[in-house]
From Swiss-Prot:
The active site is at H487, Y496, R550. Residues 1308-1329 have a biased composition (Polar residues). This is Polysaccharide lyase 8 family protein HylA. Keywords: Cell wall, Lyase, Peptidoglycan-anchor, Repeat, Secreted, Signal, Virulence. Residues 1288-1336 are annotated as: Disordered. Residues 1-25 form the signal peptide. Residues 1342-1372 form a propeptide.
Amino acid sequence: MIKKIIVVVAFMLTGFSLTAMSASAEEITDLFLQKEVTYSGVEGGKIGENWKYPQFVGEKAVDGDETTRWSADKQDEQWLIVDLGEVKNIGELVLQLHAESPVYEILVSTDGESYQSIFKEENGKGGQPTKKYIDGNNVQARFVKYQQMKMWQHTNKQFYSSSIISFEAYEKKRLPEAIKLLTENLTISEKRKQQLAFEVSPAGVDITEDQIEWSSSDPTIVTVDQTGNLTAVKSGEAKVTVKIKGTEISDTIPVTVVAENKQYAEMRAKWKMRLLGTTQYDNDADVQQYRAQIATESLALWQTLNQAADREYLWERKPSDTVSADYTTQFTNIKKLALGYYEPSSELFEKPEVYDAIVKGIEFMIDTKKYNGTYYTGNWWDWQIGSAQPLTDTLILLHDDLLNTDAEKLNKFTAPLMLYAKDPNIQWPIYRATGANLTDISITVLGTGLLLEDNQRLVQVQEAVPSVLKSVSSGDGLYPDGSLIQHGYFPYNGSYGNELLKGFGRIQTILQGSDWEMNDPNISNLFNVVDKGYLQLMVNGKMPSMVSGRSISRAPETNPFTTEFESGKETIANLTLIAKFAPENLRNDIYTSIQTWLQQSGSYYHFFKKPRDFEALIDLKNVVNSASPAQATPMQSLNVYGSMDRVLQKNNEYAVGISMYSQRVGNYEFGNTENKKGWHTADGMLYLYNQDFAQFDEGYWATIDPYRLPGTTVDTRELANGAYTGKRSPQSWVGGSNNGQVASIGMFLDKSNEGMNLVAKKSWFLLDGQIINLGSGITGTTDASIETILDNRMIHPQEVKLNQGSDKDNSWISLSAANPLNNIGYVFPNSMNTLDVQIEERSGRYGDINEYFVNDKTYTNTFAKISKNYGKTVENGTYEYLTVVGKTNEEIAALSKNKGYTVLENTANLQAIEAGNYVMMNTWNNDQEIAGLYAYDPMSVISEKIDNGVYRLTLANPLQNNASVSIEFDKGILEVVAADPEISVDQNIITLNSAGLNGSSRSIIVKTTPEVTKEALEKLIQEQKEHQEKDYTASSWKVYSEALKQAQTVADQTTATQAEVDQAETELRSAVKQLVKVPTKEVDKTNLLKIIKENEKHQEKDYTASSWKVYSEALKQAQTVADQTTATQAEVDQAEAKLRSAVKQLVKVPTKEVDKTNLLKIIKENEKHQEKDYTASSWKVYSEALKQAQTVADQTTATQAEVDQAETELRSAVKQLVKVPTKEVDKTNLLKIIKENEKHQEKDYTASSWKVYSEALKQAQTVADQTTATQAEVDQAEAKLRSAVKRLTLKNSGENKKEQKNGGNNGHLNTSTGVDQTGTKQVKPSSQGGFRKASQFLPSTGEKKSIALVIIGLLVIASGCLLVFRKSKSKK
């Protein structure tokens, strides 16, 4: 492609005017195009004689192709020289950079030896794309050199060099061809002002303010000054023109001035209500708490605001903030300060000095910090969204005050926003905005439109925003199955999707009822995603981590999207927005879902605490108050989200999610130093949700072993932070079939493009109550280990116990919890019993996985890890295990004997199971056959028998290649009862046309030749065991026995027809009816009935247990025989004799009175003792003995021996009581120094010295308040406080001590047995196979005295903490 610039009109610059030179077109060609270049290096360097990355060589900078680039080597000093072949006049240079260096210059030479600089950049936007137009000043040169002096640093801490898309040169400097106002027509209210902006073409031509002329056709209606600031004087129409002086180049727009449009005031009022709330719930505790939060936060910001005349910042920059992130923080702080100014309960309410500080703060950010609409560095998001939105909110709050007192300031403050958010479709600096980014930018465009009452800005929003509602089949956007993708191929319902909901919801609710309301039919796509991708996706009010991308690595309360509950709270706020304009049925579903989630999570999470704004809080209150909690109904759902390789099944007991990736979907996103260890989060990770709400929530991602995530098959080799981020798999077989009740899910795991050679075929068969996990074809080598992680579950050791058992075929492990609903069982064949089971304690910080959104907290969690280790090398490895939830150990043991399913095949070609009426299969290759199903293509199939001869078959094409896939059914299809339109039938072959289905399933119901059913015949044969030949006449028995023999023959025949079966059943029933019994002598039951009657008087309480058992069994048998019409005389006589014998052996319980006098007396005497007076160990023995004594005393059936034993044990327990020493402790000096140092104030001292002092003072006060503190503790607290006082340093003393932060260390739970080198407890198989009992891994108890001392210490600490808590509470 030849690069040319067509100049329509050329001008010569004279002073501050432009003089026309020519009206004819002149063609100017790029002098550098295809010229010879030399350069210092290429990214990646050389391998032998060749560049590692030939696509980045220097020639690409002058090849005329804007899709190629030169990428310099990673060194500070890098250069590229273009040889023109001869000396040329250079009027202008154009440098288009893919990534700009911080420091570089352009030099020229005529001989290639001596160079002179004509341009130098010393403040380049490191790493950002940019285009520079450089004045050549008609210099004469043959050689032009680009010289980089400094690399730029990425947020991943790596350094990179320049990357040049194109380097161009032209003989003549380009002059303006056209000028265009950015507003095509303007409607403005009376007395309003607006700053007009323009652009000159071609891009890069510099025009100064002095060269521009502004004019109005009617100054009585509109005036415009020479900076383009327009004022609406009165109603009417006029035209405003901008012109380049000395030329005919100009642009004119019509301006209509109208009386104030009340719609603008109404929309600003809606916006303001979101920020300041209403009086509707002023008596509500949560609303009052939020108002108090606003007041507290704003006061703290007011007290820390830097108001110095020569200030360089408003608030000190947070350590974790980048330069650009600090802008977002500063504008957010200004907004919070403004909220305090307008909040009636705040100390800052309507204080003039606060208002003045807010206005001056905004001016400081625009004038001094250059938030001016053109400057930016670092992350584009902070400029266009992060800073723009809180500034817009602030200006909405200030609007009325600014308009009445200083309208010029309103225009000035809005002007940068008009440039940063010029158009909803433009993402800085040169990209097209999509999805959530578009709606976020649109919020600022809408806000500025409302601030300036600019119709065109609202039209921009009205036209641009509905584009996010379109249903897409690739890239960013909404998908028909409920998926939401951002950044091209990452699942993001959780964060970016939520931002889209919020952005669209806020915009639509503000525009609703106005002239600019959005009425786009594609809004139905949004409602569909809200239903499938939010209501059906969320679990217990939590947004699953598997759809939240890199936001899972953020510390709580550092961002709206952090933990699953925090993201869930943000989602609920957004759903309440959508409900305001949703169809009634969806609105009802939203309300029911929210009520259900709040009910499910109970008191574990407070959804009303720290809302994002008043609107979110009030809307949630409205939902809760709209109906009774009884309406809350858990939603059951099963979704295969083929467009984002995610699966979620929800039922009443649990939910399970599966996270995968493929050729279509990325493995994980790492960016801005976030999610540094997300390597394996899509390698088939399984999320099992029950009533354990802490699972996958706060602290989980900071402590979980990132190499061993539940459900994954992994190569555990060490990986660098962010390694292989954004990789898509070489394989596309990921997904599965789903009939709404069960699902057959599979993943072809292939790590070959991530520095590993591991491959595996993984399947999950999701039944109602069972998860069947199969793996096959596991092949790979590593210098670490290859493992399958059955689970790695965060547990509470004091609540969860590890159990195990085995049967002849299968073994099992369970995690039994305090809440039985949280029990989890794992059943696996004995071939899998070489499992590693570990209880592991791990510590970590969010700073370990994210450097952007962090807190200071170190988390420590315990994990139960169950894994199969294949070693360093594995070929065609497999696994099989069943996961169940909410089952007792007895139920899990029973499952190990009868799992309820059969694995039909588990190979690299086919994985299939049969369970009840289902056959489920994932075929990885062509031509696979199992259980009467022949799959011609790789596919996923569920066959369900719904009646005799009636089947529902569900098919899916997980390859998503739009091809047709077929299966042959051996039953012989007689009729198609129902079928989705994408399914066709040809004889017994069923074909799915998968084009456009994105992996989703389709079903068909067919009738086949009915199967021969023998159940009734087999049952009838079984019932005949009671008949005996001696009881019937010979002739009737002959007919019967022949019919029975024939029935058995038919039952055993595999080829018998249904007619033969039915005939055999009929003949056998007839033969049974004709049986004639041999006459029998009348049986006499008189004596039996008499003895039964005589012995009904006996009562169990009067006899010993053993004698009563014999008697009661004999009586029961006698009654049974007496009731039988077929009992023989021998049976009657035997029952009578047995009962008489049982009556004789009855032994009466002794009736001697038990004496409890002494026991009751000693219980009474010892009620005076109090726990606080005795050591913990002695009190434990005493309290248990006292409890047992009281139990025996209360028992009416206690024997004298039991009473005497209880008395003896209690007396012994009383004697061993050990009193706590009561020596008086002297706290005089400690209390004195505390009193003397209450005068100090934090503002007078350096932060580091104050921290040491305040902690010492706090500890001293704690010890002083403790009634159980020892003299040593008192003395130590006093010494520590005296030392801290001495070290206090005044702020003006010049000392600047660096504060150190201590990081957390990963810890492991050590036990007395089975500890490996990492400090984790190994639960290994015993020599007999299976596992040792959990009790074998209990730690050694040590001496009783040591335990006692530990308990005493813990009690002292706990008492102190309680006193401190009460004291701090009273101070508040």
